Structure formats: C-alpha cells, structure tokens
C-alpha cells in the first residue's frame, strides 16, 4: 500500500475508534484524542486537496490488503460508506477506478465483507441515476441477484436486496436488466415499470422470502 494512503487510513481508523470510544463511555471526563504525526504531504492530502477522494482510495486499498485485519477493514468500509453518501463522491467512484474493486468484494470469502460491499453499492446508487447506470456498465445486477438468493449469510442477502432496491427504482434500464436475471417464475413476462413502487416492492419481497440454496 502507498505510504501516504496507509497513513491516511491509520489516521481515519484512529479517529473513528476514538470517536466510538467517546460515544460508548459513561465517564464525564473527555476521552483522550488520538493524534497521529501528520506530515506535510498528509496534511495537504487531507486539507489542501481532494481529501474525500484520497480517503476513498485509501479505504479501498485497505479492503484489498492482506496486511489489514478484518476489524480494521470493517472500519475502512464504514468510513467508505459514509463518504459515498455524498452524490459527488458516489459519482467519483468511476473516475477513481473504484467500482471494479468494490464489485469484486461482493464475492469475498468473508460474509461481512460481502455484506458491506452490497451496502456500499446500495448507498452509492440510491436516488442517483448516474451511479445506477454503473450497475449495468459493471454487470453488477447478476451478482446481486445471485447473492440475494444463494448467499449463506442472511445479513449479506439482505444487503444485496437493499442494493437492488436502490439501484432499480426510477431507473428503467437497471430495472429491465434486473428482471432478466431473476429466478424463473418471478415475473409473468410483462415489463415492470421502474416507477411502480408497489410492483417493485412485491418483487423484492419475493427475493427476501427466497429460500437460500446454501445453509447458513
């Protein structure tokens, strides 16, 4: 991992951990603030440049790094998800080259990694046509449908359905692509309007009730 990216990740993790400890503490005394030695390059990246982009890239590097343990990957994922709640940051995923590595994590061996990847995708595409289109460009919907019906982890299946729900509502191209990959018998063959919330809800309810093909 690039040294500056690694330092940015550590800074983000340490400050996230300190904030959580402070929130969980019942002690009236303020929790000590974690301070890292931020060099000029890091300060420039954090405050003088595209800090959100740098943190997004650092988080993704951590998520694919064998040197980062699962606990810290979860923190990196949490930070990443909060960053892409911003539509501008969500739309920056493609220029930063982050869509492909994010989608790859849907097939990670760790269930929590799959769950968080689906959650992040759902956050990125919600009410965002530009990002919804990336579900087609990067062929994400077949993976999400398979995950929602066969992932051994219920929490991962639930987030896959959430990602689908966010991705197809009010965006017909994604809706049409989604229907193509549904299990047999889910639809009558008629076109489903992406603006028909009741029809979409009924379809997603079927997915939620779909028996997993693999025991949890």
Curated annotation (Swiss-Prot):
Gene3D superfamilies: Leucine-rich Repeat Variant. The keyword Lyase does not apply. GO terms for cellular component: cytosol; endoplasmic reticulum. SUPFAM superfamilies: ARM repeat. One of its GO terms (biological process) is regulation of translation. GO terms for molecular function: adenyl-nucleotide exchange factor activity. InterPro entries: ARM-like (IPR011989), ARM-type_fold (IPR016024), Hsp70_NEF-Inhibitors (IPR050693), Nucleotide_exch_fac_Fes1 (IPR013918). The keyword Repeat applies. It comes from the Eukaryota. Pfam families: Fes1, HEAT_EZ. ARM repeats lie at residues 27-68, 87-126, 129-169, 185-216. Keywords: Cytoplasm, Repeat, Translation regulation. It is found in: Cytoplasm. Residues 19-39 are annotated as: Disordered. Functions as a nucleotide exchange factor (NEF) for Hsp70 chaperones which accelerates the release of ADP. Required for fully efficient Hsp70-mediated folding of proteins. Belongs to the FES1 family. This is Hsp70 nucleotide exchange factor fes1. It comes from Neosartorya fischeri (strain ATCC 1020 / DSM 3700 / CBS 544.65 / FGSC A1164 / JCM 1740 / NRRL 181 / WB 181) (Aspergillus fischerianus). The gene is fes1.
């Amino acid at each position: 991992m690039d040294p500056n990216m690694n330092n940015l990740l550590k800074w983000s993790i340490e400050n996230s951990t300190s904030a959580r400890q402070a929130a969980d503490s019942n002690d009236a005394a303020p929790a000590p603030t974690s301070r890292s030695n931020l060099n000029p390059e890091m300060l420039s990246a954090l405050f003088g440049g595209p800090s959100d982009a740098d943190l997004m890239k650092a988080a993704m590097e951590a998520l694919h790094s064998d040197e980062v343990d699962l606990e810290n990957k979860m923190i990196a994922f949490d930070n990443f998800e909060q960053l892409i709640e911003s539509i501008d940051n969500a739309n920056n995923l493609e220029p930063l080259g982050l869509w492909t590595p994010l989608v790859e994590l849907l097939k990670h061996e760790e269930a929590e990694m799959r769950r968080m990847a689906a959650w992040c995708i759902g956050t990125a595409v919600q009410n965002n046509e530009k990002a919804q289109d990336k579900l087609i460009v990067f062929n994400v919907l077949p993976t999400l449908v398979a995950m929602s019906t066969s992932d051994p982890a219920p929490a991962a299946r639930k987030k896959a359905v959430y990602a689908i729900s966010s991705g197809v509502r009010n965006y017909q191209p994604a809706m049409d692509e989604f229907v193509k990959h549904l299990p047999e018998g889910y639809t009558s063959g008629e076109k489903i309007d992406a603006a028909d919330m009741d029809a979409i809800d009924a379809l997603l309810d079927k997915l939620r009730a779909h028996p997993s093909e693999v025991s949890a």
